[in-house]
């Protein structure tokens, strides 16, 4: 009787101890997790503050972009004076007194003489401006003018085929390639017209003088020279 009672006491003591151990372990583990969650919350709060700082980004300085030219349909037209920048569409425009007068509406004209129109704000009179009054914009409201310029593409060389006849054809192809290059590099109809004039001039000269006839004329001139004993 006393022996069984001893086992009972042993078992009870053993299990009780293990149970207590688990209770302590669980409490410690969960407590640790609670602290980790608090750490994550603090981290996110700091990140949100960083984004708030970016929202308050300061604007740039005011720079001269053009001068007043004339009035057109309740808007003012200004001539671009900046050499390397153009204003963005709808950007705010300021007067010489640094007061906002309107926004850029359109940009037009050849690349060496650019104009832009300004849609005036309510209460601003177009007749209040004088010729060559300076116009300003924020330095963050401009774009480099070079992004609107197309770089001339290199002319691809026509490979020559073996044989005399093939060489003559290659020369003719080269002449046409130059004409096409003139059209691309002219950046306008004026350049294109010049290219055509030069091509026809050379062609006509070839017929009169023989040697200036171009690739095709050169081939025929060579044949003629052969017959004459040249």
From Swiss-Prot:
Biological process terms in GO annotation: snoRNA guided rRNA pseudouridine synthesis
GO MF terms, alphabetically ordered: box H/ACA snoRNA binding
Record keywords, A-Z: Nucleus, Repeat, Ribonucleoprotein, Ribosome biogenesis, RNA-binding, rRNA processing
Compartments reported by the entry: Nucleus, Nucleolus
SUPFAM superfamilies found in the cross-reference section: Translation proteins (SSF50447)
Region called RGG-box 1, residue ranges: 4-56
Location of the region described as RGG-box 2 in the Swiss-Prot/TrEMBL record: 169-229
One GO CC term on file: box H/ACA snoRNP complex
Domain of life where this protein originates: Eukaryota
Amino acid composition bias (Gly residues), ranges on this chain: 1-49, 163-230
Region (Disordered): 1-53, 158-230
Short name of any one Pfam family annotated for the protein: Gar1
Biological role: Required for ribosome biogenesis. Part of a complex which catalyzes pseudouridylation of rRNA. This involves the isomerization of uridine such that the ribose is subsequently attached to C5, instead of the normal N1. Pseudouridine ('psi') residues may serve to stabilize the conformation of rRNAs.
Subunit structure: Component of the small nucleolar ribonucleoprotein particles containing H/ACA-type snoRNAs (H/ACA snoRNPs).
Family statement drawn from the similarity comment of this UniProt entry: Belongs to the GAR1 family.
Name recorded for this polypeptide: Probable H/ACA ribonucleoprotein complex subunit 1
Taxonomic source organism: Dictyostelium discoideum
Organism phylogeny: Eukaryota, Amoebozoa, Evosea, Eumycetozoa, Dictyostelia
């Amino acid at each position: 009787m006393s022996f069984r009672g001893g086992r009972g006491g042993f078992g009870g003591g053993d299990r009780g101890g293990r149970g207590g151990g688990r209770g302590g372990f669980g409490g410690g583990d969960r407590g640790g997790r609670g602290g980790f969650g608090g750490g994550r919350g603090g981290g996110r709060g700091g990140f949100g503050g960083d984004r708030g700082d970016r929202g308050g980004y300061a604007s740039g300085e005011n720079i001269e972009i053009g001068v007043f030219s004339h009035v057109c349909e309740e808007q003012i037209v200004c001539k671009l004076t900046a050499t390397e920048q153009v204003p963005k569409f709808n950007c705010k425009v300021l007067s010489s007194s640094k007061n906002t007068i309107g926004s850029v509406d359109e940009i037009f004209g050849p690349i060496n003489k650019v104009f832009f129109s300004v849609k005036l704000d309510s209460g601003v009179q177009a007749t209040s401006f004088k010729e060559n009054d300076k116009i300003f914009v924020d330095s963050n409201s401009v774009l480099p003018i070079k992004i609107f310029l197309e770089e001339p593409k290199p002319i691809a060389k026509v490979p020559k085929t073996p044989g005399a006849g093939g060489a003559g054809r290659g020369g003719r192809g080269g002449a046409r390639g130059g004409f096409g290059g003139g059209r691309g590099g002219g950046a306008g109809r004026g350049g294109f017209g010049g290219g055509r004039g030069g091509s026809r001039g050379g062609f006509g000269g070839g017929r009169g003088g023989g040697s200036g006839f171009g690739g095709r004329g050169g081939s025929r001139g060579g044949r003629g020279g052969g017959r004459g004993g040249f």
